[in-house]
Structures are given as C-alpha cells and as structure tokens.
Design a protein with these regions (language model features):
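Periplasmic/cell-envelope proteins involved in peptidoglycan metabolism and beta-lactam response
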Residues: 1-289, 309, 318, 393-403, ...
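Beta-lactam-recognizing serine transpeptidase/beta-lactamase-like catalytic domain environment
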Residues: 73, 201-212, 260-324, 328-564
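Extracellular/periplasmic catalytic domains that process cell-envelope and extracellular macromolecules
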Residues: 73-75, 157-161, 216-217, 247, ...
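Acidic/histidine-rich, surface-exposed loop or edge segments in extracytoplasmic proteins
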Residues: 75-83, 115-120, 213-223, 479-482, ...
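Short, well-structured beta-strand/strand-turn elements
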Residues: 76, 145-151, 245-246, 342-344, ...
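Short secondary-structure junction motifs
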Residues: 145, 249-252, 340-342, 407, ...
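Ligand-recognition elements built from short beta-strands and adjacent flexible loops
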Residues: 471, 519, 533, 541, ...
C-alpha cells in the first residue's frame, strides 16, 4: 500500500489553493468595481439599450405668420417609416423589401440590405403623406409583418409657394431652418423633441403597451412678421412684370417699409424660388439661361443659379445707388445750412473737377436752374457743386450718420455692408455726390431715405413683429415683442420737411413724374447707375435702374424702393422703367393701407365709376338716373324702354365716359375697329377714340400731360368692338425722366 501525500505537501497545496482563491476574489472584486462603479454609466446605458427601444417624437414646428396672422409657413402632420431588422423574421425580409419599395417607390435591394442588419432602427422614408401611411398599415396587417413601424412626424409647407421666400427661408430634411427666418429664429420655431420608450424582451420584440413611457414633444413657438401679404403680393407682381418686360438679366429687388417704425411690409428679390422645393430651379428666366449650356456645363451652372436664386438682393447684393443718393447729399447740405431754396446753378452739360471732366446725363446741359429745378432735373454738375460745399470730411460723417458704413441690423441673415472709397478726395467726393463709385445695399438706401423723410430719425429696419405661443383654446399669447429702435437723429425735422417738399416736386413735374399716382402726394427720386465693375471686368455696359420714394409726401408713412438690375430690352433710365413700377405698386397699396386719396378736379373726371344697370327701365327713368350721377349718355332707337346698354352693367368706366342706351329695334353691334394707339400722345389718342364713338381710360403713372405717350392698349389694335366700349391706354413719359 502506497504512502499518501506528506503533510508538508498538503500544506503547500492548501497555501497555493488559498493564494489562488484570494487572487480570484481580488480579480472578481476588480471586475465588479470596473463594471458597477468605474464603468457603471456605460454599462447601464448598454443594458437599457438592450432592454428598451427609444423612438424620437418630433415636435410641431412653430408657424410663421404675416402681420395679419395669415400663415406663410406651417407644419402639417406626416409620418416616417422605419424598420427594426432584428424583429423581422428571416422569411419576411424579402417581402418587407418588395412591399416597401413598391409603395414608397424606392430601390428594393437597398431596403433588403437594411433588413439584414443586426439593429433595431433603420429609417426607410421620412415625411410620407397620410394616404401612403394608411396603405402601409393595411399592407402590414395583410402580411402579418413584424418590425415595420410608422411614427408621427411633421412636414414644412409654404402655402403661398415663392411669396416672400427670401424672408421666410426654408428648412432641411431634419426640419431645422437653413435660411431666412426659419434659420434665424430656429430656436423659437423648432420646439423640443419628445420620446416614446418601449420595453423589449430578450429577442428584441416590443413588450405590451403598459411597458411604454411617453414623453410628450413641446411644440415650437410662432413667429409673426411685419410683412403684409397683400403688400408683398403687389410688390412681387409688379416687380416681376417689369423684370420680364425689361429683360433684367441680373434680376430685380424691391422693398416697402414704414419710415416711422422700420417695419418692412414687403421685400422681394428676383430670381426667386419655391421653399417647398428649394433645390429646384423654377424661375423661367433662369431656366432659359441654362438652356444655353451643354450637358457637361449645365450641372456646374445649375449650382451657380441655385446660389443666385437663394440670394436676397435687398440685403446681400451691393450696388451703386446713382441719383437716388442725391436725397442724402441734399439732406446733409440743407442741414448744414450750406444751400437753400434760393440757390441757383448753371449746367453747361459738364463740370471740371481737378483734372477730370465729369458730364451731366443731359449732354446739352440744363442751363440756369434753381435748387428745386436741379433736383427735378437730377443735374449731376449741380450736385457735384453741392457736395463740394459739404466737403469730404463732413460728407463722410453724414454718410456714416445715415447708417451707410454699417449693416442696418435687420433680423435677416447674410446682410452685407457697403463698399466705400479707399481714398476720399476731390474727385471721389464729386462722384459720390451723385451716387457713383461706391456701393451700398438696397436696404441701406431705403433706411437712409426713411431718415431723410420721417423727421430725421435713423430707424433699424426689421421683419419680425412678435413671438407667440399657441394656447389650448387656439388663441395666441405674445411671449416676445419687437419695438422700433431709433439709432440716432441724423437731420432736423425742419430739414426733413423741406426735403420732402422738394422731392414731391420731382414726382409732380420732374424726373420722377412716371411714379405719379392720382389722388396721392408721392415724393421720390429716380436713379440710373452704370455698373463700373462689370464694365472694367468684361467691357460690357450694364446699368441699375431705380426709383426710391415715399408717401404721403406731407406726412410720410411708407417708403418704396424699386431696383431693376441690368435691363436689356432697350430702356435703361430709372425715370422711364423703374418709376412706373413704383407708381403701380403705390396705386395698389396706398388705398389698401387706408391712406385716403385727395383728388383734384381734373383727377375726379378720370376716376372709374361703376356702370349702373339700366336695362328694362323706362328711358325717362334711365335718363334721370344718369343725370343725377352726372354721367353722359346717348340714346339709340325710338323706343320708350332701355333694352341694352354699352358699357355693360357692373363694369367700370371713367366718370367722363358716355353710356349708349339702346331702345326699340336698336342693338349694339361690333362694327368699330380699334386703331393702333401706341406712341400717340394721350391727347391725340383720346381724341381719336372719342371721334369713333368709343370711351377712353388712361392708366399709368404719368403726370406729364402732353409729353406722355401711349405704350400699350386694350383691346388690341384690330379688334372689332361695339360703340361705347372702353379702350384702356397705358401711358409713360420719356421726356425729362432720363435719370
């Protein structure tokens, strides 16, 4: 029988075993410390992730409203489709891919590859409409599928498409603002996301509803703009029409602003885009330009055109303001007492400054003129003389005081500051006096003119009126308001009033006469500036044609700027092509803005009246009614009852028109051929139409009398119409408005 282990051997084994056990315990303690203390948060997060499934609940993005609470940007409920690959049975993967690809019009193989992943979330498609979501639900039920889910989401809509697009901006696929108000006020608009936390079992399947935790999303706040959708509509309408008619290859820009508060009622820039599909080029002039490029160049040019349509020319692009800047030169010289209405100027068509000869736009010169006439004529030599009196130091100080060396501070992104001279001496002062060889933005220009007209106060322009929060009862609670900010007093109220008087005469008898609006006192200044930088770079001559003004001239409330960039249709002068646009806009918006007209007796005769219904009335009753309304008439036929009339009831006609009353067997017949009236004077066209038994309506913004010419007509020349038809002629003046 063999001997067992010796006592010493057992002792050694026991000691070794004890050491091993102690080491094991130390190691286990270390592991426990590592997992439960040192890396507790990490492993807790992993454990929770394995036991729960989080779904982010998107908040409703706040709306953007006009000042009248008309929705300009809204979020509508949609749904997002995603899959949980770990929850999809092996035999269902191809079915899931085929079905989703068919319903959502996506690539089947791409979806199938997502079903093979070992996770619990793969996004398939975001923001699908309710009808598509319902189709997916029906398909899930029909196929009895697991792992295909729909979750609530929101989609941004812009009900008015491209209207005010450069102010509103747009959002990206994640509903985060990328430009405009959507970007600047994103922190207010976006809200706070919620969560749906669902428990799941060991194989990744969701547990019943009672194991869910729901954290509600907090919806975003609403932004109320100073923009008036009606004013915005008219600004865009007339600006786009002018841009197309004048073939402005670099677009157009326009602003309507309250001169007292700095509130921007409308701001438009062309070319523009639809924020519902901001990546798509829809502007027809841009699309036509792209057709000139081959397939290889087109992609590169499309990128350039997208950048162009996204640019807000009102605040991003700088330009030479030309003669519209004479308002600022006039204001500073009057404020300093360096000139008065008693000053006179002589213009031979040029002026010598140092070693330069600077010419007036009128080659023969304006001759002897008063200060008022120099402004009406937009005489360059006169304003060079005025600028010289101010001097370079004082001139620059006023330039700075009018806010032209800094950004306006408008609550929009991308605002540029102006470009001033690197040196400012005698020649530079001369060209600056009439708005050449330096650059500012359109918004800087209208803000400066606002100060010149509102009593001398420089006001910060803004587009946001207030931030609101929608209450449970649907009402809006204001959580933040934006009040007018006056930066400084630039000129005195007395100087401002004199500037207004002088600029009103520019519109009544001067270069701005095409901006005249019946019944309203409009003041303003035209401008035509050469794009010197383009000339130097390419050798080609292009111009900026503009008009800036305000109304009412005796108590200014609203300023307007119209800028046409690089017109190529033939005319370039602001007085000819920009002033009429401003006049058309003002004619539409001033009555809407409750500015009451005050008509002269001559204007009253040209106003439209509603044509009364006289048919089936006795001839004597019809005559009495027309006599009472002071409307002229002519009777055809020998009956006692009015059987027909021309113009027709419910239409409109000028007060001075004649109504034809048909009685007995007499009937209106189309027997008069409308003549071609284009290029006729207003008087000549009116006389010819009247001699043919037709009525005339004169529209347009000309207060130029005999110098106004017909530029279009309706009905067109050659159309055959009945006696008494109203022929509308549109007029414009090209005399004395070339600047």
């Amino acid at each position: 029988m063999g001997k067992g282990p010796s006592r010493s051997m057992v002792k050694r084994s026991t000691i070794l075993l004890g050491i091993f056990a102690a080491a094991l315990l130390v190691w286990m303690a270390g592991v426990l410390v590592k997992y439960q203390i040192v890396n507790y948060n990490y492993y807790q997060t992993r454990a929770i992730a394995q036991q729960t499934m989080d779904t982010t609940l998107a908040p409703n993005r706040g709306s953007i409203y006009s000042r009248n609470y008309t929705p300009l940007a809204i979020s509508a409920p949609v749904e997002t489709v995603y899959i949980a690959p770990n929850s999809i049975d092996e035999e269902d993967r191809r079915t899931v891919a085929e079905g989703l690809a068919s319903i959502l019009e996506l690539d089947e193989d791409a979806i199938y590859q997502k079903t093979l992943k070992k996770n619990y979330y793969e996004m398939i498609k975001r923001r699908i409409d309710a009808e598509v979501a319902d189709e997916i639900r029906a398909w899930i039920d029909e196929k009895n599928l697991e792992g295909v889910h729909l979750v609530e989401d929101t989609k941004r809509y812009y009900p008015y498409n491209s209207m005010a697009c450069h102010i509103l901006g747009f959002t990206g696929t994640d509903n985060v603002g990328l430009d405009g108000i959507e970007s600047i006020y994103n922190e207010y608009l976006q809200g706070t996301s919620g969560k749906l936390i669902a428990a799941k079992n060991a194989i990744g399947t969701e547990l019943p509803y009672e194991y869910e935790t729901y954290v509600a999303a907090e919806n975003g706040k609403n932004v109320v703009l100073t923009i008036d959708e009606t004013v915005q509509y008219y600004l865009e309408k007339h600006l786009q029409e002018a841009r197309l008619e004048q073939k402005c290859i670099e677009g157009a820009a326009g602003i309507v602003m309250n001169v007292k508060t700095g509130e921007i009622l409308a701001m438009a820039s062309f070319p523009n885009y639809d924020p519902n599909n901001y990546y798509t080029i829809t502007d027809q002039m841009a699309l036509d330009a792209l057709e000139e490029y081959g397939q290889e160049e087109r992609k590169e040019q499309e990128t350039a055109f997208r950048n162009k349509i996204w640019r807000n020319k009102c605040i991003v692009d700088t330009y030479m303001p030309g003669s519209t800047f004479k308002i600022v030169t006039l204001s500073m010289a009057l404020e300093e007492g360096l000139i008065s209405t008693n000053n006179t100027y002589s213009c031979p068509g040029y002026i010598r400054v140092a070693d330069r000869t600077i010419r007036c736009w009128k080659s023969g010169g304006h001759g002897h003129q008063t200060l008022a006439q120099a402004i009406q004529n937009s005489c360059n030599p006169a304003f060079i003389s005025i600028g010289a009196k101010v001097g370079p130091t004082n001139f620059y100080q006023y330039f700075k005081n009018f806010g032209l060396t800094e950004k306006t501070g408008v609550d929009l992104n991308g605002e540029a500051s102006g470009i001033w001279f690197s040196k400012f001496q005698e020649v530079e002062l001369a060209t600056a006096s009439f708005g050449q060889n330096f650059k500012i933005t359109p918004l800087q220009m209208i803000t400066a003119v606002g100060a010149a007209s509102n009593g001398g106060k420089l006001v910060t322009p803004h587009v946001v009126k207030e931030i609101t929060e929608t209450q449970e009862d649907g009402t809006e609670k204001v959580v933040k308001s934006f009040t007018p900010q006056v930066k400084r007093q630039v000129i005195s109220a007395e100087t401002s009033a004199l500037v207004c008087d002088l600029l009103e005469e520019v519109v009544t008898v001067g270069s701005g006469k095409n901006a005249y609006v019946k019944g309203y006192r409009v003041a303003g200044k035209t401008g035509t500036s050469e794009k010197i930088d383009v000339l130097n770079a390419t050798g080609e001559k292009y111009y900026i044609s503009s008009f800036i003004g305000f109304a009412p001239a005796d108590e200014p409330e609203y300023a307007i700027l119209v800028m046409l960039d690089s017109p190529t249709a033939g005319e370039i002068y602001g007085g000819i092509i920009a002033a009429p646009v401003a006049g058309d806009i003002l004619a539409d918006i001033l009555p809407y803005l409750s500015i009451q007209p005050q008509y002269t007796e001559e204007e009253l005769e040209t106003l439209d009246v509603s044509v009364p219904s006289l048919m089936e009335q006795s001839l004597e009753e019809a005559k009495a009614l027309l006599i009472d309304k002071e409307i002229k008439f002519k009777v055809k036929g020998d009956g006692d009852t009015v059987l027909d009339q021309m113009p027709l009831p419910g239409s409109t006609m000028p007060q001075s028109s004649t109504i034809i009353l048909y009685t007995g067997d007499a009937k209106p017949s189309k027997n008069i051929t409308v003549p071609n009236l284009v290029d006729y004077s207003v008087a000549g066209a009116s006389d010819r139409i009247a001699s043919m038994g037709l009525n005339v309506r004169v529209v347009g913004n000309s207060n130029a009398g005999s110098t106004a010419l017909v530029i279009s007509q309706s009905p067109a020349a050659g159309e055959v119409v009945p006696e008494g038809t109203v022929v509308t002629i549109r007029t414009n003046s090209s005399v004395g408005v070339q600047n």
